[in-house]
Regions:
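Long, contiguous hydrophobic alpha-helical segments, chiefly transmembrane helices and signal peptides
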Residues: 37-39, 85, 156-157, 176
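Short, motif-level signal for alpha-helix interfacial/capping segments enriched in acidic residues
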Residues: 55-61, 96-109, 189-194
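Electropositive, glycine- and tryptophan-enriched low-complexity nucleic-acid-binding patches
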Residues: 146-195
Length: 195
């Protein structure tokens, strides 16, 4: 499995290097988009509970060495720099990261251990709200009205391939719950799941 992880990291770096950089060209640019992407991805791979604890862990010498060895990345942006760079990235630009990783796992036989019945897979679904406001909103917000007060939110449905025998899971492309063109009704997690 370590060889597969190494190949996955190479694939991830290639996918992340394709992210559009929305900054104006400058000689003062310190970080590449791929470094910001690897910095964000590393929080999950190293299983740190937050960006802050991840940054604190990397400040220690041995963790920094482990990070460089695993991710082949010398420059690590801070959590704020990662947010500033990646917040402007369109979610569709991240889909190849998931697709390419899943294709590689399948080609390397990594998905076989997750097979359930008749070559199928168990999929865990989790819907979550990651933004909510009674004032600030955009065209992608879901609107909930309660007692005459509108609450605007962003929600996402996350699907993951799981197995009862394996502690790791394989994330699939998240589906954002947002208004769909040509539909009068608001989007919901059930509809997002069908997409």
């Amino acid at each position: 499995m370590p060889k597969v992880l190494e190949k996955l990291m190479i694939e991830a770096k290639e996918s992340l290097s394709e992210l559009k950089d929305n900054r104006k060209p400058s000689r003062a640019t310190k970080y590449k988009m791929e470094e910001a992407g690897i910095g964000a991805l590393s929080v999950f791979i190293m299983q740190d509970p937050s960006f802050l604890s991840h940054q604190e862990r990397l400040a220690k010498g041995s963790s920094q060495h482990n990070f460089n060895g695993l991710f082949k990345c010398e420059n690590i942006p801070s959590a704020n720099q990662i947010r500033n760079l990646l917040d402007r990235t369109k979610t569709e630009e991240c889909a190849p990261l998931y697709h390419n990783g899943l294709s590689l796992l399948e080609a390397e036989g990594g998905l076989a251990q997750f097979e359930f019945i008749d070559g199928g897979y168990l999929i865990a679904l989790d819907g979550m709200e990651y933004y909510s406001s009674k004032a600030l909103h955009c065209e992608n917000c879901t609107i909930k009205n309660h007692k005459g007060v509108a609450t605007y939110s962003h929600s996402v449905l996350c699907a993951t391939i799981v197995s009862s025998d394996i502690k790791e899971a394989i994330p699939l492309v998240p589906e954002f719950v947002s208004p769909q063109d040509g539909h009068d009704k608001q989007d919901c997690e059930n509809t997002a799941c069908k997409r």
